[in-house]
Each structure stands twice: as structure tokens, then as C-alpha cells.
Amino acid sequence: MSLNVYFNAAPLLSPKTGIGQYCLNLMSELENISGVDPHYFYGGVWSDELLRQAPTSVSATKKFKRTVAQVIPDLAYGLQQRWRGRHFCKGIASTASAVYHEPNFLAFNTPLPTVVTVHDLSILRYPETHPRDRVSFMTRRLGESIRRADCVISDSEYGRQEILAEYNLPPERVVSVLLAAGSGFSPVAAEQLPALLAPFDLQSGQYVLSVGTLEPRKNLTTAIKAYARLPEAIRQEIPFVIAGMKGWRTDGLDREVAALIEKGQIRRLGYVPDEALPGLYSGARVFVYPSLYEGFGLPPLEAMACGAPVIVSNRSSLPEVVGDAGLQVDALDVDGLAEAMNRLIGDDVLRASLRQRGMERAKGFSWRRCAEETLAVYRKVVTG
């Protein structure tokens, strides 16, 4: 008998962030495993197809969201959740072989055995890096979602330990299932890079790169301050390239980069589609990711898979992901980060070593294994 997996696929609606990538890669692998029958919920629309773009009928959900959000933000979150929950429950069949997987923190209240993926606890650890209305809503609802779940999945062992400590759960109720870089993330051949980088006006090996949504938690301000302390000659030759869509509270970042943008030393690319990222990673002289807090941290792993030497902060899950395959610095140590960037930019031998070690480490992470371990969680909660 097939296992029916009811999956809230709303994070797949473009543009996809890290959670959207998690959904797409996990479900793509699960579809290739026999005995799994997936069903996808797209914010009010059910489908048995794994969609890579938003269906047009989702526009009604977006209109509803905009309308209620104009009233009271906290109320808007609650109304959206209840409205979607009702539509979700209309499409499920409660059988002896069915499970509901919520990949994005807050589970609907359903009669099915429930698995929730909690990617991080940044809403509790760094509330100042989130909008106030989101903090208010999530702080109250996240605990309810976690306690309601039959099993909680964390992206890392670091995250698992945080959840266990915060919510005082039995160890068997929380499982760490590591993520991976997508199959498209691999080194791009040197002869192909000029054409791939031309739309961004970049040359292979001649830029420092950072990728991620622009928001306070990503700590790009520290990275920019560190870059600004590099010798002028380096900055004139090797710009700092920032790829990622705007999140919130970017005014400080905008002020920080204005002068360097004017000099051409910082390039902001905005949102970069998934298919363009391997080329960007492969051509980077150095990849920098000084995040204050991550539940996993996909961009450094993607960068390593593409052969970019990486520098990350030594906080949260990032040491677990990168290990000794990259340089680690304190997230708020501007001088330390500047020193690491300067060293890696100028040391050909170190870059080559980290490039090789990074590619080898990235091979140890697999979406197939992620899917198999997630499926084991499904079967565990279904059988009780």
C-alpha cells in the first residue's frame, strides 16, 4: 500500500528562498521512491503535480493575504493560517496510510499524523532580525505547532539540540535530517564561465561573492565593513558581489554600500534565478557568508559544491556544514573577517586546497539520503 504524503507546498511559490529549495529537492527525490504517493497544497489549490511555478489560481490567496494584512498584521497571520487550514483539510483523506508534512514551521490542525520541519529558532534567538508582527505571531504559534507534531524535523544537529532544550521534548520526538546542495550545483567548466558571467559584467576569479536574502540576520553589514578595510588596490580589481532579493530592514545596508557602489567596488545583483547560481559560485574567487544564525546554511554548501573557497561565521550550524573545508571567523569580528578575506584572495595555494576540500565535503550531503531519512520519519509516525 502506498503512503499518501500530504505536503504544504506553498514555499514553492516563486521566488524560492531556502525553504522553497528544501521543498523542491525533498519532494523531487520522494517522487522517485516507490510506495510514496504525494499530494501538494498550494495556498488553496490541491495538485498531484510538483509545480515549479505558482498556479494562476493562487492569485485569490494572494489577494486575500493583501486585504487582511492591511487591517492588523498579527490578525492577518492568524486569519491566513486558519483560512488555508480549512482548505487544506478539505483535500485530505484520513486513511491508515497517510501523513501530513508541514515544511515551514506552522502546521495546520488536521486529523493526520503530522511531521513539522522547523528550520531554525531565529525568531526566538534573534527576534530583532525579524519584523515585529512576525515575531509576535510566531512566538505564540510555533510552540503549539511543535507540540502538536508527532515528530519534528530539524535541518541540523545544532538545530535539533536547540529545539529539545527550548521545548523540553523527548529526544525521539526531534530528528535531524541534513540538507544538501541541488544536483545542478557543481563546478562549471572554465571555458563556459565567460558566457555565464557576461550578463552580470563579471570575470571569473575576479570577485568576492555573497548569496542570500538581504536581511539583518545575514550580517552583510559586517561583511561590507570588512571588505572596505581591504587595500584599495584589491577593491579596485576585485569587487564584492551581493546576490539576493531584498528582505526587510535594508536601509542600513543601503547606506553602508552607497559609496562603494559609486566606486564600482560593490555590485548588487538582486534576485538571481537558480539556474544562474552555479556559474556565479564557480567564478567566485572567494565566497563569504558571515551569518549570525542559521538552521543549516545552504549557500555555503552550494558554493563548496561548485568549487568556491568559502569563509563562514563560526556560529550556529555553519561549522557543522562547512567543517574544516572553509575558513571560520567570529560573525561580528570585522578585522578578523577582513584578514580572512585578504588572506584567501591573495593565497593561491590556500584557495586551491579549500576548493578541493569543499567539493569533497559537499559530496557527503545528499538529497536522496535526506528523502530516505524523511520517509523513515513518515513511516514511524504512521505506525505509531
What are the functions of these language-model segments?
Residues 1-384:
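Carbohydrate transferase catalytic cores enriched for Leloir-type hexosyltransferases
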